[in-house]
Structures are given as structure tokens and as C-alpha cells.
Amino acid sequence: SLTLSSSDQTMSDGPFTSANNHPDGQFGHALIKGEDLILEYIQSSSSIDDARLNISTIYHAYKDILGFYNTESERNCGNNVACDEGEYSDQIRSVIFLDMNGYICSAVLINNTSYDLTPYVLTANHCVDSESPGEHNYFTFYFNHQSSSCNNSNSYYNHYRTGSTLRASYYYSDFALLEMDYTPAASFNAYYAGWDKSSSNPQV
């Protein structure tokens, strides 16, 4: 198994096994706070498989995009959704903070007409069109990354899933549809947003 942690042991991710790999063998993980990263690999002495660990990419976030250090900062670029009167309390839980190998975009978890909770994610084509084939495997999907109250309180950064497959995209309408490798955990309390093609007024 593989575990990643910060040098001061205040954050860790894992343990992971080969079962966490994308079908092509690739794997990505969430951001870890700090200047140093510790990788700990443990393998049973009875294992007959050879360990193969290839680190293809390392990136350092030069901005505190997850609020590790400044959790009470004002974000004047938009309204705090926690300050609304509850009209969109469900839809808020569908919004995703999408980390694409050091680039960030917003996205939304959407439902489908089969209502089978396939974890489809809608985002913009311009967010993913520069990615090389296979890089979607490293995408990290953060849920509940918003202030938990109207006074800019802490947001979550431990509600996440990594890995996805690009299912569809179109340049002119600027959309991209991803399918996450894993469904959101029940503890995320994620909401599947959606729409239909009927002429009925939407209900929120």
C-alpha cells in the first residue's frame, strides 16, 4: 500500500493499493499541505508481485487554492452561497472544485435519465481541451468546498475523489462531460443536479 503525508504528519492521503489505479495504471491524489511530501510504500514479504512505482509529475501550488493557510480570507469574486436563504441548499452540494493538475475550474455533478447515480460531471471544454490524453486520470474533484456559514468559515478539502474519463466535449458550446472513476462517498452528501428538455418551468 502507498500512503502520502506532509512532513509534519498533519495531513495524509491513503493508504492506496493497485485497486485505486485507473484502468491504464495511472493514479492521482489530492493536494497535501506543506513544502515536503513523504511517500511510504509497504509491501507484504509474502507478495509475489514486483513493486512498480513511477512518479510522472509533481506540481507545487503557488497560490493557497484550497485555503490551507488562510481559511478566513474574503473572496470578493462572488457571493458566499451559505448566505442565501436556503433556496439553493440542494444545488450547492452538486458544485465541484475541480483541480486539473494545477489548474482549477468549477464543475457540477449531474444526474441522468436513468437515475442510476453514475458520477457524471459537467464542466467547460476550455478547462480540459489543453489536457493530454490520459491526464483526466489525475483530476481531483473536491466536494463541499465552500464556506460552511455566512461568515466565511472554513471549507472542506477532505471530501474528494480522484480520476475520471472524458466522455464528451464540444468546442463551440464549450462543454465537457467527465465521468468520475468513483462515486462520491455518502459522507459527502453530494447532490445530483440536472435538467430535462421539457417546456415545464424548472423547480428548485
Predicted region positions:
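Serine endopeptidase catalytic core focused on the charge-relay Asp
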Residues: 31-204
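Beta-sandwich interaction modules
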Residues: 8-36, 42-47
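Extended low-complexity, serine/threonine- and proline-enriched intrinsically disordered segments
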Residues: 1-11, 140-142
